[in-house]
C-alpha cells in the first residue's frame, strides 16, 4: 500500500527514483540494535550541513558490513524506525539503503522487544512505513566508507525488472567526481 493505493511492483518503479544525488548518513557510533530516530537523522543532517531534497537517495552506514559472511552479521548495526523512515519519505526520498541485514533493527532485537511488550508494531516498523508513503530500500550494502564524503555524489541503483515482484536485485554504484 502507498497512501491507500496498491504498492508498486519492482517493474513499476520509476527509473528516476534510481539515479539521483546521494547522501551518506553515518550512524556507526550507535549500538547494535539501537533505533535510528528521526531526531538522529536531523542531527546527522545538521552535522554534515545537508538538507534533504526530493529524490535524494539516502544511504545509512552502521558499520554492519564489516561483519558480512560471519554469523554475527545478522545482529550487527542499528536500524531505522517508522518515524525516521517517514521523516525521509515526507521530504520526497523514494530510495534508501543500509549496510546492515535489514532497514529495520536486527531481527533478534525486534523479537526480544515483541516478547517483552507484545506490541506487533515493533516488528518491521520501518518496512511498514511504506504503507503510508511508498519507498524502496536496499539492504546489505557494502563499502559505503569508500564513497569518502557525505554528499556530492550520485547513486545509480536500477533494479532487475521482475514482473509483479515485490523486490528485486540491484547493484548500487556511487559515482564520485
Located regions from the model:
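Active-/binding-site microenvironments in catalytic and ligand-binding cores
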Residues: 1-177
Amino acid at each position: 500500500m502507498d497512501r491507500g493505493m496498491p504498492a508498486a511492483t519492482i517493474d513499476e518503479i520509476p527509473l528516476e527514483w534510481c539515479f539521483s544525488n546521494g547522501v551518506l548518513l553515518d550512524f556507526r557510533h550507535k549500538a547494535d540494535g539501537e533505533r535510528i530516530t528521526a531526531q538522529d537523522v536531523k542531527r546527522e543532517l545538521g552535522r554534515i550541513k545537508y538538507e534533504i531534497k526530493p529524490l535524494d537517495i539516502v544511504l545509512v552506514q552502521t558499520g554492519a558490513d564489516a561483519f558480512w559472511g560471519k554469523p554475527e552479521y545478522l545482529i550487527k548495526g542499528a536500524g531505522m524506525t517508522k518515524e525516521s523512515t517517514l521523516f525521509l519519505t515526507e521530504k520526497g526520498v523514494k530510495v534508501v539503503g543500509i549496510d546492515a541485514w535489514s532497514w529495520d533493527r536486527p531481527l533478534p532485537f525486534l523479537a526480544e522487544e515483541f516478547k517483552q511488550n507484545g506490541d506487533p508494531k515493533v516488528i518491521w516498523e520501518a518496512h511498514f512505513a511504506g504503507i503510508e508513503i511508498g519507498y524502496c530500500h536496499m539492504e546489505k550494502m557494502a563499502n559505503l566508507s569508500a564513497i569518502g564524503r557525505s554528499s556530492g555524489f550520485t547513486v545509480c541503483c536500477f533494479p532487475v525488472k521482475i514482473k509483479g515482484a515485490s523486490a528485486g536485485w540491484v547493484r548500487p554504484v556511487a559515482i564520485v567526481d
